[in-house]
Amino acid sequence: HVVDIENLIGPDHRGATVDQIQAVLAEYRELVGAKEDDLFFYGANPGLRVQVMLATGSNQVRGYKGKDGADRALLDVVGSDWVVGQFDRVCVASGDHAFAPLARSLKGEGLHVTVVSRPMSVSAELYTAASEHLVLGEGLAAA
């Protein structure tokens, strides 16, 4: 799981609390059917990293300062060469176009790529690169 937490929370991510992060991640986990032993990498700006670590209990929280810092950090950690051969499915929790080349590469290698975004918040490039697209807030409404 490649989780751009800022993208999942939305425009008000700067003031996100541990409870808010846990709530959006619980919805994400249910939506994609995440298992307890799944591998997660989280991306967040340096100002949000501590809250994400507390919310997840994970030290796999990456982020750089500056524009698209969380995206760039996640892409540096999760390259297609490392993923191919170890996994058969990758979930990208973001709508950002920056993840489209990774999704396209993984899908081209035969992996199932699930993209999860907020409603109306996925780039066309990432949408077409994915095997499937799930939307937070819509998948659980019918449950």
Cite the ranges covered by each PLM segment.
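A short acidic, amphipathic alpha-helical/loop segment
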Residues: 77, 101-106
